[in-house]
Structure formats: C-alpha cells, structure tokens
Amino acid sequence: MKNAFLCLTLVLSFVIADPAQAQQDVKPVRMGSGIMTFDTVPGWGLRPDGNSAVGPTHGGVVVDKAGNIYTSADQGVFVFSPEGQVIHSYLDADFTNLHDMEIREENGEEYIYGARNKNAEGIKFKVKGGEVVFKLPFPEESGLELKRFSPTAITVATNGDIYLSDGYASNYIFRFDKTGKYISHFGEKGNGMKQLNTAHGMTLDTRYEPHRLLICDRNHTPKGRLLHYSLEGEFIDEVVTGLGNPTSVAIQGDYVSVPDLLGRLVILDKSNTIMAVLGFNSDPEQRRNYKVLQKDWIEGVFSGTHGSYWDKDGNLYVQDWNVSGRIMKLVRVK
C-alpha cells in the first residue's frame, strides 16, 4: 500500500512539474489598446519538453526578410521559425554575449551587426552561414584613454556608417564607416541635458527626415528618457521622459517599441505619445529581476524586458533579461 501511494505521488509530482503539460494549459493573454492590441502565443520559443530553448538571455531580437526570428542569448544566437521552432543557431565563440543586434540587407545579402559588451567589441557577420566580416574593437585612433570598453548598442545609417554605443562604460558613441574605419565619437557620461548615463539602446530613427539616432538614456535623471542625436553627433532634443528603464528601441513605420527593464513594453507613435503599454508587471519583486525562474513566469507579464522587434505583419517579438531565457511572440490583433 505504501509503495502504491509512493508511486502515485511520484506520478502526480511529475505531471505537475512537467513544463510541456503546464504550457498546454496556458491560454493566450490579450494586451495593449486600440490598433496596438496583441495576443500572446503560449509556449512560443520553448522546446518540445516545455523548457527554454536558449538559456540565459541578455540580448536583442531581429527578424530577417524571410520572417525568421533571431534572438541573442549568452551562449549564442538562435534562429526561430515564425511558429517558434529553433531552425538554426550560431554557437561559436564569436556569437556569444551579443547585447544588441541590428539586421541589414546589403547588395542582396543580409548581415547582422552586434554589440558585444562582455567582449569589448562590435561585430558584423553574414546571416547566411555566419561568416564574420569584421569586428570593431575600441578605436585607439580616437585618442581616448578609457579604462573599460563595453558596447551595448549598434545601428547602421543608410550610407553604411556604423554607430556603436559604449553604454556600460564611457557612454561615448563611436562612428565608423561601412568598412569599419573609425570616423569620430560624441557624447559623454553625465546627467546634463546633452549627456548620457547608460546609453543602453539605439537605432536609426527613420520616422523623420533627415534620419537621426534614437538613443535610450536608461539611467539619466530623470530616468527613462529617449534622445535624438544627428548622424554627425549633434544633440537635437530630448524626445520623451518617464519611460522607466528603457533598454532598446525598434521602429516600424511611425511606431516605436520600447522595452522597459521594469517589466513592460511601451509603444510610441510618431509624436512620441504613448499608444499602448504591454505586459506590465504589478509585482515590484519581479521587475528588473534577472532571476525569475521559468516556473514563475506569468503569461502576458514581463519581468525585465530587454529587446524587441517587429515582423512585416506588425507582430512583436520580445526578449526578457532572464536567467532561464525568455522570448515571446505577440500577435497583432486586426
């Protein structure tokens, strides 16, 4: 009798603890408002056994022209189909710790540009095959004497110029030409209007002419602001404040998705007015918390939103800064 009871207990424990079974019971969660309403896709990006497919995440997301999704994790870059299955991965030493990514088509071929904070460099590699084109170490020709170089963001202008933000160290933004040759640097660390205090994320803001840089100034006081700088490195304006801890920015048309490390994602329109807030976490213990285990994830609730990207249909892919490794798909409701 005791043996039978023990067997039953073990079976029940296995069923309850089985991540795959748990995912089958999760229902989609609707979030947002108006034209920026989304449904979650439970279990998207997980392995068949229900566990995370990527391991710890502290990176970004991009989508190629075929609709495949690339997310960077500590151990490398994983490629997902739109349905959420891993179809490829880049796990060589060159692809670890990509804190931010940008994808770009050049002469009919796609390339990923990455900022590697722990490896003190930027990188460019081919999407097809993963061949490394070049790396961007600290440019000695800048004349700066830095104790540390820790790039957190990268973007590329229409003419091919590359911008690499040293967001975890000096807060200078370094400009290179399309071959990787150093051109200039601008910005400095501080809390002044034109200064940067953790220039954590950055993209090319194509909503305006001329194009400009849209920069996440994560720890500036007041916290949570986005800035515009010209492509020549001139301060333009303070775009918006009060966004918590903005980590990155991704643009589609007139809209910008802004992951906030405090457990939400904000969507702005062309006037930089908030259109929707997604995945808000009401538990202060889970906000900006890397150590939220997969068993404690809540569908439709974020904990440390770090990267995002749009696909051609307006769906969003969102990565949490997370010890278990979390990436989510949000389907646009139309």
PLM features: what roles do these ranges have?
Residues 50-66, 94-109, 141-161, 192-212, ...:
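Beta-rich, blade/repeat-based domains predominating
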Residues 39-51, 91-94, 133-149, 181-197, ...:
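Surface-exposed loop and turn segments in beta-propeller and other repeat-based domains
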Residues 42-75, 325:
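Beta-strand-rich domains and repeat architectures in extracellular enzymes and scaffolds
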Residues 68-70, 111-113, 161-165, 212-214, ...:
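Conserved beta-propeller blade signature
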Residues 301-334:
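Blade-level signature of beta-propeller repeat domains, shared across WD40, Kelch, NHL, RCC1
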Residues 74, 117-118, 167-169, 207, ...:
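Short loop/turn segments immediately following the C-termini of beta-strands
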Residues 23-43:
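Blade/loop signatures of beta-propeller domains
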Residues 48, 74-112, 116-117, 140-142, ...:
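Blade-loop segments of beta-propeller domains
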